[in-house]
Amino acid sequence: MCSAAGASKLSDPNSINFRGGDNTAEWDDTYRSLLGCPVTNLTRDQFRQAARKRGSGWEMYTYGAHKTLFWLFAVEYATLNSQKSFNAQKDANGFSQGGLGLGPTQMTDWVNFNNSNPLIPCGYTNEFGNSSGEKAYVVKNSSDGTHATLMANRYRGIENPFGHIWKYTDGANIQVTTGDAGLSILWTTDDPSNFSDTSYTGYDKKGNICRTLGYAKKMLLGEDGDIVATEIGGSSSTYWCDYYYTHTSNNRMQVVRVGGDASSGSAAGLAVGGTNYVPSDAYRNFGSRLCFFPKYKSTEITTTTE
């Protein structure tokens, strides 16, 4: 999600109106500038409300939207491993091959560099338009040397679909209970009027998910193709090829984050799932996306603060 309303007309990405990350102003015009970068360090509801300021039908990134994106990629490239090397050439039958590359996942010493704030400005891969591709982004240090080189990627017009910063999703909640009989249950909805950080009302109960972290071996799937792990035991190159994070020590509602971040390495990808944080968490490496859903354009959405 870009850092201010009107991002669709990003005529001057270096304007202070488009300062992203945690909004550190003293970094403007330095090697750590956050101007033009995606906004982070907000709670899920803050992302939700920011998206809705654009008007009816606008929402933050949803679990349903990401799930659709994953399956479009999997069908087009005939692989579950989104981090396979990018290959711009079609195979002998005219089909896409390879994957989307490592993505921006190889950042070193990120915390000390800029407190794990975003690194790549929005629109860096716009030259690919609605196509797919990857492009090296050089992270400069204080002496204008190279601190790290990240591979920004794009899938069908969507920039950095994984890596760089974690993406908060709406429309999916995890109900966690503790103890020997404890469960972690996935609840989802596509209806923005039901989106909530405190209730499962209006959500569909999808099933029990994995309570141990590791590389995903099996996903919940079902008739809706849910991509939250039910079993671990894979690796970065087998089964679902991405990591699964969870937390089971507290009775609480948890969220679904996707994609991994700039330091995730081979654990990142389109199928990585982070179900270990709560809706009120806000971190410099947590962001989201802006989505428009024409079906819900006329939906009247009201929220209450509790």
Outline where the language-model segments fall.
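Short aromatic-cysteine micro-motif
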Residues: 1-161
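Alpha-helical structural elements
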Residues: 13, 22, 26, 53, ...
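Residue-level detector of alpha-helical recognition elements and their boundaries
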Residues: 81-84, 177-179, 290, 305
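A short, polar/charged loop-to-alpha-helix boundary motif
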Residues: 175-189
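C-terminal, surface-exposed recognition/capping segments
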Residues: 49, 64-67, 71, 91-134, ...
